[in-house]
Amino acid sequence: MSTIIDIHAREILDSRGNPTVEVDVVLEDGTMGRAAVPSGASTGAYEAVEKRDGDKSRYMGKGVLEAVAAVNGEIADELVGFDATEQVSIDRAMIELDGTENKGRLGANAILGVSMAVAKAAADFTTQPLYRYVGGAAARILPVPMMNIINGGEHADNPIDIQEFMIMPVAAENIRDAVRMGSEVFHTLKKELSAAGLSTGIGDEGGFAPNIASSREALDFILKSIEKAGYKPGEEIYLALDCAATEYYKDGKYVLSGEGKTLTSEENAAYLAALVNDYPIISIEDGMSEDDWDGWKALTDQIGDKVQLVGDDLFVTNPVRLAEGIERGCANSMLVKVNQIGSLTETLQAVDMAHRARYTNVMSHRSGETEDATIADLAVATNCGQIKTGSLARSDRLAKYNQLIRIEETLGEIAEYAGRSILKG
C-alpha cells in the first residue's frame, strides 16, 4: 500500500519570483507527499548543482523545465514501484541514476524535490508527523531561532558587507515565546530605523535593509531595539552574524567595501574577534571564505572556544567537506541546507557526522524560499537545537515559525525548547 505509483513535478515560483521545482509523490493507497525546493543567492562553489534551463527567453534563463522533465521522466520511471518507506534506497537509486559527483546531470533540485516528497508521503502513510517519522521517538527539541533582522551583502541592496545580523532569544520558555520576543524586537527596530530616517524596506529574508555602511552601526541599532523592547542583550537575547565572507574575498584579501577596508585573513580574524569582544555575539557563520582553510583555522584558534563558528559555504552540508574541516580543526558547527547536498539521506548523514565530531548543527532555509516548511520538521527530527529561517516578515519565513509552534503544541509536555543549552561554556 505504500508503493509509489506516481511522481509528478511542476515549475512554481519561489519568494524571489524565480522558478523552482515542486514535486508530488502519490502512493498506492492515495496518500500524497508534496515538496518544494529552495534556492540560494550566495551559493557555495562546492554545492550540488541546481539545474537551470539557461533559456534567456524564459525567466531570464532561470527556468527549471529541464529539472521538471527529469523528475517526470527518468526519475519517475526509476522509482515507480518502490516502497516509499525505503528512503535510503530511493535516494541512493536517484544518486546512481544521476551518475555525477554533484548531481549535475539530473539536478539537485530535481532529486531533492523527490526525496522530500517521498519522506512526506511515507510519513502520512504511517500516520506520523514528518518530524516523528524522520527523527523517531527522541525528536522533541524545539530549536532556538536565528532571526535575521538586518540584511546586507547579497541579500540586500545596501552597502553593508556582512550579510545577516540576527537575534537569538535564548531566554524564552518555549518556541511560542521565542517567536514573540523576536517579533517585538523586529517591530521595535522598525521604529528605530524609521526615526533615524532610514529605510524600512526588507531584504530577501524579511530583515530590514537600511542604507548604513558600518557593521557596528547595524549592531548598535539592534542592541538599542532589544533594550527598548524590554529585554537584556547578552542575557535574554544574543546576537549572531552571517558574514558570507566568500562574497567579499578577492585575490586572497577580504574587501569590506562598505567600510573601506581590505584585510588579510589574520586581520579579518582580528576584526571579527573585536566584534565578539564588544558585542554579545555567540555565533558567526562563514567568517572566512570557503577556500581559506588557513583563515578558518586562525579564526577557530582565536575565538572558537567562545563562539559558535558555523561553516556554510565551507561545508555545504557535504560529509566529504565536513570531514576535511574536522581533520583541520576548522569551525565547530555546520549549517544544514538540504539543497546543498540534494537528498534527505545525505543531509541526515552529514548531521550525524557533525554530531559525532561534537560540532553543532544549525538547520537552515535559503534566501529563495517557498511556503514549504519541511526544515521546521527536520530541525525537530534531528534535535539540532538551532534553526535559521529568516525574519519576522514574509510568509515564506513565517511558515517555518508557525510550523514549529504547531509541532510544539503537538508534542505537548515532552517538548523542550533548546534555549540556553546552546550557549558555549
Curated annotation (Swiss-Prot):
List the GO molecular function terms: magnesium ion binding; phosphopyruvate hydratase activity
Name the positions where (2R)-2-phosphoglycerate binds.
Answer: 163, 337, 366-367, 388
Q: Which GO terms describe its cellular component?
A: cell surface; extracellular region; phosphopyruvate hydratase complex
Query: Which InterPro entries does its entry note?
Result: Enolase, Enolase-like_C_sf, Enolase-like_N, Enolase_C, Enolase_CS, Enolase_N
Which UniProt keywords are given for this protein, alphabetically ordered? Cytoplasm, Glycolysis, Lyase, Magnesium, Metal-binding, Secreted
Q: Which domain of life is it from?
A: Bacteria
Q: Taxonomic classification, please?
A: Bacteria, Pseudomonadati, Pseudomonadota, Alphaproteobacteria, Rhodobacterales
Q: Name the enzyme group at the top EC level.
A: lyase
**E.C. number, please?**
4.2.1.11
Protein name per Swiss-Prot or TrEMBL: Enolase
**What is this protein's function?**
Catalyzes the reversible conversion of 2-phosphoglycerate (2-PG) into phosphoenolpyruvate (PEP). It is essential for the degradation of carbohydrates via glycolysis.
Report the catalytic activity.
Answer: (2R)-2-phosphoglycerate = phosphoenolpyruvate + H2O
Record text on cofactor binding: Binds a second Mg(2+) ion via substrate during catalysis.
Reported cofactor(s): Mg(2+)
